[in-house]
UniProtKB/Swiss-Prot annotation:
It holds the Pfam family Sugar_tr. PROSITE patterns: MFS (PS50850), SUGAR_TRANSPORT_1 (PS00216), SUGAR_TRANSPORT_2 (PS00217). Active from 32 to 42 degrees Celsius. Retains 50% of its maximal activity at 20 degrees Celsius. It comes from the Eukaryota. It is a multi-pass membrane protein. Keywords: Cell membrane, Disulfide bond, Membrane, Sugar transport, Transmembrane, Transmembrane helix, Transport. Residues 1-29, 100-104, 151-165, 229-293, 353-358, 414-429, 477-504 are cytoplasmic. Disulfide bonds join 61-70. This is Hexose transporter 1. Changing residue 310 to A: Reduces D-glucose and D-fructose transport activity. Belongs to the major facilitator superfamily. Sugar transporter (TC 2.A.1.1) family. Residues 51-78, 126-129, 187-207, 315-331, 380-392, 451-455 are extracellular. GO terms for biological process: hexose transmembrane transport; monosaccharide transmembrane transport.
Length: 504
């Protein structure tokens, strides 16, 4: 079919203005970073699939009638589940420092780190060594939490930051899905009342599953070393490499006219440099009401995400489903759940720029409430009825879908759009750290609470989703389409007032 002159003119105008399709140059750069997001999701989920095999091989319930359910296993499993999140807190705290040396360099360090840690985890033989290895895995995840969204934010067209930002969450869910799929090779898992030892294949396979991220890390290293050697335009400009910054912007915007984004970066860098000269550190910013306000909002928004209960479902779903299902259905349902989580993240790529960040966050809270509240009430009335068991399972899927298209991907986009450039690195790191601290608070006791009464979790998550809805409705502002380094919470005049005053 021959194109009309009008169509050709329209295409040329699009190129001139730097408008291109989703699968543009930026897409390739984003993919190179999202390999780390995949490792993130895989590392969070892998233990959920293979935990019982480790319990049997390490004999945590030795001498007990039930080799899977004993007090020693409950305590050690809780520590093992929480160790990743504790490590992530430490990683987030360090990530703000690491990204100062380069966004691409940060990713390269992360891939090398995961390569070594995955090997270490696969050769552990004791509780203390596997606990240490999982802490290190969590540390790497904490680095990913800040580095990848920052890289994506600085390597993409301003009108597509949301869509590309969703890819971080998409690859996290893909990693979760792959971890569960690989676990299928071992079957249903060891029986609690059996004395039969693990097969040689099972003993080998769970270690290979821990080793798998090292292979993915090598792919990430290869991508950055061979194909994607450039740093982000913001970082390059900040280091005085103006022409390099301009050249990479031409690739990102697919046009020679990049004056507008270059000027936006210039203004952001100047504000950041002024902040450094005037010693506007995170602690200094917290003393200024306008900056303190946006930092607190970011930390609250980040922490509240964990009270949707998403990491309880991801890291401990097998334990939760034991309350409702026979063992032969648990693995199948976990696979379906992770597949839904992965697939339902795709719509967010397209709707995050159409509906905006705030609208998606609000609808996500409504979805979580609709999922949990009826389930909590039904569990209190008659926990053992088949209807309540089915309702509980359906609720987890409604929650997963709601999270996948809203709070999951949107938070990491928002944290790198809400803060002004002079505090973005440190404030985003702090907010991410708060997210992982809240994950520990939620995940650590979940194993014990599930055994006592799952409805307690449903009630807590229901109440928190209501509080989160009103918090977002009244306090959170839209950031869609904003220039890099700006903030809807602090005017340029307010920022300049603090940037231009003399150092005392």
């Amino acid at each position: 079919m021959t194109k009309s002159s009008k169509d050709i003119c329209s295409e040329n105008e699009g190129k001139k203005n730097g408008k291109s399709g989703f699968f543009s140059t930026s897409f390739k750069y984003v993919l190179s970073a999202c390999i780390a997001s995949f490792i993130f999701g895989y590392q969070v989920s892998v233990l959920n699939t293979i935990k019982n095999f480790i319990v049997v091989e390490f004999e945590w319930c030795k001498g007990e009638k039930d080799r899977l359910n004993c007090s020693n296993n409950t305590i050690q499993s809780s520590f093992l589940l929480a160790s990743v999140f504790i490590g992530a807190v430490l990683g987030c705290g360090f990530s703000g420092y690491l990204v100062q040396f380069g966004r691409r360099l940060s990713l390269l360090i992360i891939y090398n780190f995961f390569f070594l840690v995955s090997i270490l985890t696969s050769i552990t033989h004791h509780f203390h060594t596997i606990l240490f290895a999982r802490l290190l895995s969590g540390f790497g995840i904490g680095l990913v939490t800040v580095s990848v969204p920052m890289y994506i934010s600085e390597m993409t067209h301003k009108d597509k930051k949301g869509a590309y930002g969703v890819m971080h969450q998409l690859f996290i869910t893909f990693g979760i899905f792959v971890a569960v799929m690989l676990g299928l090779a071992m079957g249903e898992g060891p029986k609690a009342d059996s004395t039969e030892p693990l097969t040689s294949f099972a003993k080998l396979w769970w270690r290979l599953m821990f080793l798998f991220p090292s292979v993915i890390s090598l792919i990430g290293i290869l991508a950055l070393v061979v194909f994607f050697k450039e740093e982000t335009p913001y970082f390059l400009f900040e280091k005085g490499r103006i022409e390099e910054s301009k050249n990479i912007l031409k690739k990102i915007y697919e046009t020679d006219n990049v004056d507008e984004p270059l000027n936006a970066i210039k203004e952001a860098v100047e504000q950041n440099e002024s902040a450094k000269k005037n010693s506007l550190s995170l602690l200094s910013a917290l003393k200024i009401p306008s900056y303190r306000y946006v930092i607190i909002l970011g930390c609250l928004l980040s922490g509240l995400q964990q009270f949707t209960g998403i990491n309880v479902l991801v890291s401990n779903s097998n334990e939760l489903y034991k309350e409702f299902l026979d063992s032969h259905l648990i693995t199948i349902l976990s696979v379906v759940m992770t597949a839904v989580n992965f697939l339902m993240t795709f719509p967010a790529i397209y709707i995050v720029e159409k509906l905006g960040r705030k609208t998606l966050l609000l609808w996500g809270c409504v979805g979580v409430l609709v999922a949990y509240l009826p389930t909590a009430i039904a569990n209190e009335i008659n926990r053992n009825s088949n209807f309540v068991k089915i309702l509980s399972i359906v609720a987890t899927f409604v929650m997963i879908i709601s999270f996948a298209v809203s709070y999951g991907p949107v938070l990491w986009i928002y944290l790198h759009e809400m803060f002004p450039s002079e505090i973005k690195d440190s404030a985003a790191s702090l907010a991410s750290l708060v997210n992982w601290v809240c994950a520990i608070i939620v995940v650590f006791p979940s194993d014990i609470i599930i055994k006592k009464s799952p409805s307690i979790l449903f009630i807590v998550f229901s109440v928190m989703s209501i509080l989160t809805f009103f918090f977002i409705f009244f306090f959170i502002k839209e950031t869609k389409g904003g220039e890099i380094g700006t903030s809807p919470y602090i005017t340029m005049e307010e920022r300049q007032k603090h940037m231009t005053k003399s150092v005392v």
